[in-house]
Amino acid sequence: MATERHYSPLDRLLLQADTAMRTLLPFSGQPARPSPAIIQPDADLDEQQSRHIAGLMRINHTGEVCAQALYQGQALTAKLPEVRKAMEHAAEEEIDHLAWCEQRIRQLNSHPSVLNPLFYGMSFGIGALAGLVSDKVSLGFVAATEHQVCKHLDEHLEQIPHEDEKSRAILEQMRIDEEQHAESALEAGGYRFPAPVRFGMSLLAKVMTKSTYRI
């Protein structure tokens, strides 16, 4: 019968460093699922459309970088083993989103945001602090963050032309996954943040979206 491996604090720190490198280095994230865009036809996009869609996908890619860092920070400080496992599992699913977004950005002849290391560090710190407060707050932060991501995805789906079926397929699958992450966090006992806290989080999200759209 297999036994669960127990990691020392140093082991976990090294694993976190490895995850950070795989998140931030180009082409280093290996998705477990193929991109939904693979089976979709190419669209005849003009230069302005391609540039705008690339900007939106860059925002989504950075959002996934932040989510990955958030989950890793929370997993590092989670008090209950089952909560830590849930965070690590969610982080694994976010790798798919990271890879899909990067692939699409490259197809549009653009690049991920140069600000990703900054946002990774900030999000990791926030996640670790939330985990130190309590698992309930940590899970609640996941739910609130994922709901914010879903809102961004909805806004982007409204802006992306219907003929760009590749980008739309990616965002639609991401939305399904993110909504599931949010609901799972609440079902696991996550705290439902009040409106003022959610509003503050939305303001921080706007800083990220405005800055990463172009760089």
Curated annotation (Swiss-Prot):
The Gene Ontology CC terms held by the record are: plasma membrane
Pathway(s) per entry: Cofactor biosynthesis; ubiquinone biosynthesis
Tell me which residues bind Fe cation 2.
Answer: E94, E146, E178, H181
List residues binding Fe cation 1.
E64, E94, H97, E178
Broad EC category: oxidoreductase
BP terms from Gene Ontology: ubiquinone biosynthetic process
Alphabetical UniProt keywords: Cell membrane, Iron, Membrane, Metal-binding, Monooxygenase, Oxidoreductase, Ubiquinone biosynthesis
Keyword Metal-binding listed: yes
User: What name does UniProt use for this protein?
Assistant: 3-demethoxyubiquinol 3-hydroxylase
Which organism is this protein's natural source?
Pseudomonas putida (strain GB-1)
Q: Which gene encodes it?
A: coq7
